């Protein structure tokens, strides 16, 4: 088995390792696109402060876009002996660009990189959820207006309590979703923060 980048000179309990990181490679496949996006932003910054030449940036961005396209089609694979998504992306770059490919890690902790990937992934998933909730909300509002004159009884537990309508029943669910959107918005704001520099040295 290949030596892991985080491994030190002592034996790790295999059961603990399996429980904590045993499925990392499988889960890393979901992060491939976001790892590439994080690297694209990082190398753009490196070029802006003079740590990469413009020609190097252009070549790295071109190759990263190719890797992104592979990941976007669901064809990204972490090869045997490669530890994780970060190492696989670097391997693909060095296969095409040689030592230049290793420059994507300049000034960046791998733990920082993990946090960036997770935040970008979570941000994308939250947006997908919000878009789906918006579609459902609009449908409920449409039904609420459509059936506003269709009467039905309102209940307290199992006892008829007040006159109501089918439209009001739909509207109640729509209002519940509006409250949920506030939580999703808060989650998005918390996720949409740059973690770079926070994951090393503590």
Spans of model-derived segments:
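A helix-coil-helix interface module used to build multimeric assemblies
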Residues: 1-202
């Amino acid at each position: 088995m290949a030596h892991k980048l985080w491994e030190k000179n002592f034996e790790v309990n295999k059961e603990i390792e399996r429980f904590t990181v045993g499925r990392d490679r499988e889960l890393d496949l979901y992060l491939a696109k976001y790892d590439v996006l994080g690297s694209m932003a990082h190398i753009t910054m490196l070029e802006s402060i003079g740590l990469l030449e413009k020609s190097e940036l252009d070549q790295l961005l071109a190759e990263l876009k190719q890797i992104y396209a592979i990941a976007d089609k669901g064809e990204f694979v972490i090869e045997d002996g490669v530890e994780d998504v970060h190492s696989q992306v670097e391997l693909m770059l060095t296969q095409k660009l040689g030592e230049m490919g290793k420059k994507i890690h300049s000034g960046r902790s791998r733990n920082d990189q993990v946090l960036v990937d997770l935040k970008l992934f979570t941000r994308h998933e939250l947006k997908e959820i919000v878009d789906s909730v918006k579609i459902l909300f609009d449908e409920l509002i449409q039904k609420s207006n459509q059936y506003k004159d269709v009467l039905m009884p309102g209940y307290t537990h199992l006892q008829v309590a007040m006159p109501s309508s089918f439209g009001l029943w739909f509207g109640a669910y729509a209002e519940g979703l509006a409250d949920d959107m506030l939580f999703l918005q808060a989650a998005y704001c918390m996720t949409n923060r740059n973690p770079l520099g926070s994951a090393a040295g503590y």
